[in-house]
């Protein structure tokens, strides 16, 4: 929807210009001002719609990006302080790179260069999701992943933690480094140990 909003603002721009304008617009966007593709419709069908004037919970949203069709909802209701900070930093970086690209100082390849997540921080938390079968593992990992945002909220409430940045990638752990409470000698090929890495920086 952010791309669509950019296209609305620059309807005749080329693809390259749209990419640059995307980063320009949203590097300067003053959140929590909402991104709207169209004005909300006054349709009285008794569905709950995003409206911070009425719903106190909507007022707490940090990065509201509102779906255009009725009933309008905030598509980014799960964004917290840390994820907002991470996205803002990435968008600012994208704007800096596209500025250089548009000025002919670098190529588009630079915009897609991968970053080393583990070089950004000094402190890490590793979540290990372990179960006995592949079927159980799939369900268990899904449950663990669904609860990570609650862990982030807890970390953000710690005054000594400035940022909690989730790494969405999963890793197979080194068996010798697993905690002793996990059965390292299980040779069942259906057992999948996945580590979900988080990182936090102290203020």
Functional labels for PLM-detected ranges:
Residues 1-203:
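Non-catalytic helical "accessory" subdomain of NTase-fold nucleotidyltransferases
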């Amino acid at each position: 929807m952010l791309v669509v909003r950019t296209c609305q603002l620059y309807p005749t721009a080329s693809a390259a210009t749209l990419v640059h304008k995307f980063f320009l617009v949203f590097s300067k966007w003053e959140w929590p001002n909402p991104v709207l593709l169209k004005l909300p419709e006054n349709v009285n069908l008794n569905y709950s719609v995003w409206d911070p004037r009425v719903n106190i919970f909507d007022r707490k949203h940090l990065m509201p990006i509102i779906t255009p069709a009725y009933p309008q909802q905030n598509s980014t209701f799960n964004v917290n302080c840390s994820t907002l900070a991470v996205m803002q930093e990435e968008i600012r970086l994208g704007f800096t790179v596209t500025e250089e690209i548009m000025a002919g100082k670098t190529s588009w390849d630079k915009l897609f260069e991968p970053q080393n997540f583990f070089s950004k921080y000094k402190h890490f938390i590793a979540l290990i999701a372990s179960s006995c079968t592949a079927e159980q593992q799939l369900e268990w990992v899904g449950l663990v992943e669904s609860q990570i945002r609650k862990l982030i909220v807890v970390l953000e409430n710690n005054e000594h933690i400035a940022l909690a940045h989730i790494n969405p990638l999963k890793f197979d752990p080194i068996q010798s480094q697993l905690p002793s409470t996990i059965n390292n000698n299980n040779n069942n090929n259906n057992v999948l140990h996945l580590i979900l890495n988080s990182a936090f920086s102290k203020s």
